[in-house]
Amino acid sequence: MVLKEKGGNLMDDVSTVVRRLTPLECERLQGYPDGWTDIGEWVDSKGKKHKDADSPRYKALGNSIALPFWQWMAERMTKVLKDDGIENPTMASLFDGIGGFPLVYSRCGVVPVWASEIEEFPIAVTKIHFGEEL
């Protein structure tokens, strides 16, 4: 946009549309594998069925952790644990959303032992990727 000397700008007649990021682009920005939150229709803990929709994906990704930093941190934590003689460390996850910490832990060779979340969609995403054991 270029401002004119007497006010206004040279692009008064041009309308601008800002494109919303897709859930796939949001997954990539947060460091998740493509399609991580694309779980289709799902059933919550009370047995209620939910249709496939982008809204819970956006919310879950917005409330999630950015994996690159936590990957860096987990690699260093794992090294410290192994340097202290703990060969097979296990770690837990508390309120991380869509399984971000278990994903990071497993990438570092650490066994995630449990995950806790209070919202239904993130619970469903975590169960899809890690099963019922978390």
PLM feature spans:
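C-terminal target-recognition/interaction regions appended to catalytic cores
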Residues: M1-D96
